[in-house]
């Protein structure tokens, strides 16, 4: 048996005997089946975040949040807070060529979040993406990675996930991923792994989801 050049699948040699043909074909079929399964829905290696490079903004490229509610930003992304006194502006920014922080990948865009006023009463400030179906990654370990920097050194309170079981479903489950993230004035990559709780025994209703949340500094 030989190995395919890209995926390393076992495949018949040019000199394989006819009597080994069925065995060789089955080995190749099993290898392909395993590879496709591993990158399929909810399987290891599948990135479920959509528009993670902030390249798509169908509703515009700059938004302001001045109410204690939420605002839709780049496609699939949303921002939530509980105090509209802390006015925030969200905008698509373009990297100067050669300055993107990811080695080997010259990204084009990033998102900027700017606070215009301070708030003494804001208790949460959350940058998030909702992934349809609470079954997504249930019972598996996932990795959440992102790049961030700030105008001045600051601390992000936490990264967390929420499993919402939909209308009429079980009570939502919140799981902390990490806390007290030191963000500096230089781009840094942050990467954290977390075990997503099983949904065994839960009741799942309509419009369930898994939420990935990056909690931002409040009162600033």
Where are these regions (language model features)?
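Extracellular "spike/adhesin" assembly and maturation modules
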Residues: 1-37
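Extracellular and organelle-lumenal recognition/adhesion modules and their flexible linkers in secreted
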Residues: 32-220
